[in-house]
Amino acid sequence: MGRPVTSQEEDARFAGRFLTSTEMDLWRTMDDFDKRHSIDVTRRFVAKRSDATRDETAAALLHDVGKSVIRLGRFGRSVATLLPVTASMRRYRDHERIGADMLLQAGVSKRTVDLVRGATDDDAARQLRAADDGD
């Protein structure tokens, strides 16, 4: 099953249905690949969790926002998951904490921050991880 083909404008409209203006500004800092991935993850997440709250859905859209401050490119990202070669690569591996800190500083809800940080292990957190893994 392939992912739906949508334009960047359609992706932004989809994200805008769930994100506050502050959150949307953060989402826009993500590179195009991560924005597309966030849409795919969110669609899988809400398909499995029809009662997802707005904060939970925002976490799905923003779960990789910490990567926006770490510009490694696709090859560098692959290497970063295998070897802690450089400080940038180590930061990439810590993108959840970085993203959660960005969201916290922006005044985003505690629930969204906790889900992005991976600080909870409830049903929503497990379903978000599964959606991120492609399940």
PLM regions and their residue ranges:
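Non-catalytic interface/linker regions that flank or bridge core catalytic/transmembrane domains
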Residues: M1-L26
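Divalent metal-dependent catalytic cores for phosphoryl transfer on phosphate-bearing substrates
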Residues: A15, M24-D135
